[in-house]
Amino acid sequence: MTSTQSPLIILDRDGVINHDSDRYIKSPDEWLPIEGSLEAIARLTHAGWSVAVATNQSGIERGLFDINVLHAIHNKMMNAVAEKGGRIDGVFFCPHTANTACSCRKPSPGLLKILAADSAGRSTRRPSWATPCVTSRREQLLNAISGLLRRGRA
């Protein structure tokens, strides 16, 4: 692997990095990290992984918050990760509800295709291979990192 290549892990946001809510995360104040998630991302960063977030954010289409609020939430998340020594290389989101016929809402592959196209266009940190770990369970994230550690990849 050259210095311009790194493995990529793709994480969901709500329920993996931060606590989820049936009422949606509608402001930066409502975004609360799950214990250990920021440190796990920092550990992946230090091991040379690129970390991306792929998240459904139907609250936009529902009118619960706008794109500026979503960016503020993501800035808070990225700053919190940075404070622990980690980095999120990109955040990709679908703003649609499940009733909208779109290809970007997970589990449809559109969001991952957008992410892949973006990653392929980067000249400084081009992933050499991808490990889609788009999940909504903290335990799955921790198990994935544990497995990577056992294989010497994190």
Language model regions located:
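Anion (oxyanion) recognition and catalysis
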Residues: 42-46, 82, 140
